[in-house]
Swiss-Prot record:
Requisite cofactors: [4Fe-4S] cluster
PROSITE patterns: ACONITASE_1, ACONITASE_2
Quaternary state and interactors: Heterodimer of a large and a small subunit.
GO biological process, one term: nicotinate catabolic process
The organism of origin for this protein: Eubacterium barkeri
Keywords, alphabetical: 4Fe-4S, Iron, Iron-sulfur, Lyase, Metal-binding
InterPro entries with a match to the protein in the record: Acnase/IPM_dHydase_lsu_aba_1/3 (IPR015931), Acoase/IPM_deHydtase_lsu_aba (IPR001030), Aconitase_4Fe-4S_BS (IPR018136), Aconitase_4Fe-4S_dom (IPR036008), HAcnase/IPMdehydase_lsu_prok (IPR011826), Homoacnase/IPMdehydase_lsu (IPR006251), IPM_dehydratase_rel_enz (IPR050067), IPMI_cat (IPR033941)
E.C. numbers: 4.2.1.85
NCBIfam families, A to Z: hacA_fam, IPMI_arch, LEU2, PRK00402.1
pH dependence per the UniProt record: Highly active between pH 6.5 and 9.0. Retains 50% and 10% of maximum activity at pH 5.0 and 4.5, respectively.
Protein name: 2,3-dimethylmalate dehydratase large subunit
GO molecular function terms listed in the Swiss-Prot or TrEMBL record: 3-isopropylmalate dehydratase activity; 4 iron, 4 sulfur cluster binding; dimethylmaleate hydratase activity; metal ion binding
Amino acid sequence: MGMTMTQKILAAHASLDSVKAGDLIMADLDMVLANDITGPVAINVFGTIDKEKVFDKDKIALVPDHFAPAKDIKSAQQCKQVRCFACDQEITNYFEIGEMGIEHALLPEKGLVAAGDVVIGADSHTCTYGALGAFSTGVGSTDMAVGMATGKAWFKVPAALRFNLTGTLNKNVSGKDLILHIIGMIGVDGALYRSMEFTGPGVACLSMDDRFTISNMAIEAGGKNGIFPVDDQTISYMEEHGSGDYKVYAADADAVYEKTFDIDLSQLKSTVAFPHLPENTKTVDAIEEPVTIDQVVIGSCTNGRFEDLKRAADILRGKHVKKGVRMLVIPATHKIYLDAMEAGYLREFIEAGATISTPTCGPCLGGYMGILAEGERCVSTTNRNFVGRMGHVDSEVYLASPEVAAASAILGRIATPDEL
């Protein structure tokens, strides 16, 4: 019986010839990650472990991004605790204000994750790095602490779902529409503790930024991880970002999948997830009554990358955000910020009536920089739209692609670029 891509990576890191779904293993870790919310909890737990130093100061990443720059005294204290721990432990990959970014955009950009790696992070969207052909998954702060101390973590080997992609995406349809389509199709628990393995000729038409978006939201279907095969695009990205040594794992021809979903990318349309779950999806052309909005957010670890900003800027160029609508643009890292500035996109956003933020998770988790009031509606390129996720419990969040978000900002209602 063959192994999936995920199972091969886990077997190698557990020094086993093979594994199967349901096996319990102890695996070596290539990177352990935390932020300013989960980091302090992990640091407190680390203090109770009989270890004075982390297992490898080069394999820990600490990124203050959720409430950074600090929004209040409490968040400042949390950032300080992470900062002091990083200093005491001489953590190589601690990223301070001015060099930080949203963690799941920053680590690939810095070359800290490569194909074949095993990565855990005390953040549920750590599954993002599957876009690079790595096994990455979110864990609790206790597992994070043990990972920092030992360089190991235990896993139950996941069963797998295969998503066989064919065709190519149409204009103004992107990876966000694909993952929303999938979550709408299988539900928020449709991939519960499964690896979501994306295969097929359609993968080649997906950019790296599209793949990051798709892997990022695997957790919104309950997935343990979401992983893409390594191809020329992946290798070019890793070489460009100095990812260092990598190893390519490919699924066996007789790998076992619980189910295969065939998806023709050319049939996908602009898709939005209605409140209050990512599975509540509709194609925009199926929305019967106009959904007017108060705010648009383009950013986050899901859609704050350069290509996302380019797509939005191309739509906004020469147009203006509708009066009464607030539009926030949040580049995911400082490099993306600079690249967008040099490309002229930030000027175009500002001239269109948007405001630009320093890199931060901010409004995505209802932290700050764009909190919603009672009764307000927001179209957001983020990844969750739970009750109260971005503010008041009686506010509403609609998840969408950068293309739909930009068009909606212009028209003041959920719309596609085709309507402009």
